[in-house]
Amino acid sequence: MAADSNCGHSDYSQAVSYLYGLQKFGIKLGLDRTRGLLNALGNPHKGMKFIHVAGTNGKGSVCAFLESILKEAGFKVGFYSSPHLVRFTERFRINGREIGRDAAASLTDEVRAVSDPDDPPTFFEATTVMALSFFAREHTDFAIMEVGMGGRLDSTNVINPIAAGITNVSMEHQQYLGSRLLDIAYEKAGVIKEGLEVIAGVTQPPVVDLYGRLSSEKGARLLRVGKDIRYRTTSSGLHYYGTDRRMEGLELSLKGSFQSRNAAISLGIIEVMGRKGFKLDEDHVRAGLKSTFWPGRLHVFSHEPALVLDGSHNPGAIRTVVSTLDKTFSYKRLILVMGIMADKDIGSMLKEIVPIADHVIYTRPVYERAADPKVLYEKARGLGAVGEVAADIPLALERAKALADSRDLILVCGSLFTVGEALTYLDPVAYCPDPVRVY
């Protein structure tokens, strides 16, 4: 997974330090600064072919499926994602390969040179512009853009995509997107644009009604998974029944029955691309689904005992993991290693998963937003599992391994930051971290 053989690089270190410094400006939703930066750079994104994916959970997996399928078909594919697990360069990929540190440093310098010191970009605005410039410079055939937050005012929404997807909607980021489910759904609907075909995995009737109305008003075509696009989960993947294609016996490399729905959304987008003149052979689709790699999502690191890492970081994602554990893994006892960000719905997350565990080790990654593990421990009182606190992730992992026998399952979860730090500890060569921590 390492982008370069060497983890250190002075120009790169300075670049990520600058980007990290932009986080002090917080989150400022809106497109004006992003458009201004792109205009100053000559609007490199104009004329590019984009795929835009929004949603509360699963959008990274949908994007990863798309990247793998298009790569198998021989296309040069860019993929912009967030957050990263261990390295900033993970956010910018072409055909699965991360951007090099020299290129990342150079792009940072270019964005910094055209930034207004009186109205500086946020971290995510700067990285979005870097991604668009990088993909344009590399002449990608397609660029897959994962929404950072919401959609309507997310900096990725400066693009004009050829296809879009919305995975699902649940409560998240209420301080920015609104306090009601429909407020959040409306923000995500910002990716629905005139003339666009949008594949949606949403299920709540009010959200379905909202998206139907907005699509009609904008002259877009909404295709729903479960209605216009159907699928059936199998032991190894899914059968897919789309608007133009039927494909049975599709195998998925990503674990969890929930991934069949994400795959169906991806295949719906592939069908949209076919109607745009980019029809892919079924062999490429099959091979792409079977070879998709997306670490940190029900990621099996080792066996006997099984050590699995999942970056689920909200109640909906935790609920999905809980519903799939027994279907995916065979184990005697479940030992959790949990680290959660302080701004998340901690109580609801714990209520979803702690009761099914046998032992829970509460910990925290080295990150200022992380909740104190003692707080997690106190909030979990009365939920059933035996609990204890470990000051950091290495201690938590060693404690979990000491407790487990070969038939147990150790699950690291609660945050992508927790998972990323765990991977760095478990395999510091493959998951070599940045010299400066940037999220």
List each language-model region with its residue ranges.
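Beta-strand->loop->alpha-helix junctions that form or flank phosphate-binding loops
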Residues: 201-202, 214-233, 253-257, 285-291, ...
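Short functional linear segments
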Residues: 1-55, 62-73, 80, 116
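Short glycine/serine- and small hydrophobic-enriched flexible loop segments
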Residues: 133-136, 268-275, 424
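ATP-dependent carboxylate-amine ligase
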Residues: 2-10, 159-160, 182, 272, ...
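Nucleotide phosphate-binding/pyrophosphate-handling subdomain across enzymes
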Residues: 46-47, 142-147, 154-165, 169-173, ...
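ATP-dependent carboxylate-amine ligase catalytic core
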Residues: 25, 31, 35-46, 72-159, ...
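Extended acidic/charged loop-beta regions that coordinate divalent cations
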Residues: 127-176, 208-249
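Aromatic/hydrophobic pocket-lining residues that form π-stacking "cages" and hydrophobic walls in ligand
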Residues: 66, 131, 211, 376, ...
